[in-house]
Design a protein with these regions (language model features):
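General marker for long, soluble alpha-helical cores
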Residues: 1-248
């Protein structure tokens, strides 16, 4: 394992020298912090082409890659092993994934936060491994925020951990079937006060009533042209419509 720059000694009065540093094959497994320390010791780019694995936090690893060829060369195809247990922004993991053609092993992570789109990017990447049992917080919130139920269901299928949507999510969209799947999933925790916009043209009244029971928000059914089901279920649906500003 690369041991920082403990073997390097300043030979002049300045802290940074024009030293040529080449990481030997015996140090193929390096920590991100030690690589950063190395290129901070010299004005000449460090040759790290022998490195096959970098270990460290996502932030530390991204610092190494962000240094660029003027500071460190030979990187771009190594395996990265993360040490984080929690990631407050999944975007940083996606950035790391883009920095190397090697695999990013994120098995250390047990909780992760980010927008639904960025989370789906991470979980859909062939370059990121080790995910699948962590707690997820979906951060989309505020006026204009909207999530597709099908996307939530897709993310739900990729982890055995609990997924929680943020307070203040404005709208959930999708088919009644997809929406009911999302609300009914044990792996998804949805606030339940968001507005709903359905995309179906034909819906079974019982399914629509089930959806209405999941949320205190308004259900927009403007696309609906046909409602099927028993007379009792249809009457319940229209009664709910009359009691709210929903459009059926």
């Amino acid at each position: 394992m690369l041991d920082s720059s403990s073997g390097l000694k300043d030979t002049g009065t300045t802290a940074t020298q024009a030293l040529t540093i080449t990481v030997a094959s015996g140090d193929a497994e390096a920590t991100a912090a030690n690589l950063t320390s190395l290129y901070g010791k010299t004005t000449v780019a460090v040759d790290a082409s022998a490195v096959t694995q970098i270990t460290g936090s996502v932030a530390e690893a991204n610092i190494v890659y962000a240094a660029g060829a003027s500071e460190i060369t030979g990187l771009g195809n190594e395996t990265v092993v993360t040490t984080d247990t929690s990631l407050s922004d999944v975007t940083t993991l996606n950035t790391l994934d883009g920095n190397t053609t090697g695999t990013v092993n994120a098995a250390s992570v047990n909780s992760i936060t980010g927008t639904l789109a960025k989370l789906l990017t991470a979980y859909g990447s062939n370059g990121i491994t080790g995910l699948g049992n962590e707690t997820i917080s979906v951060s989309d919130t505020g006026a204009g925020s909207s999530l597709a139920a099908s996307d939530l269901n897709s993310l739900d299928s990729k982890t055995s951990g609990t997924i929680t949507t943020a307070n203040g999510l404005a709208t959930l969209t999708g088919t009644v079937a997809a929406l009911n799947t999302a609300y009914g999933s044990e792996g998804l925790t949805i606030e339940g006060d968001e507005a709903i916009t359905i995309s179906d043209t034909t819906v079974d009244a019982e399914a629509l009533n089930n959806l209405n029971n999941y949320t205190s928000g308004v259900i927009n059914a403007d696309t609906l042209t046909k409602l099927t089901g028993t007379l009792a279920d249809v009457n319940v649906a229209f009664a709910a419509d009359a009691a709210s500003s929903a459009t059926i």
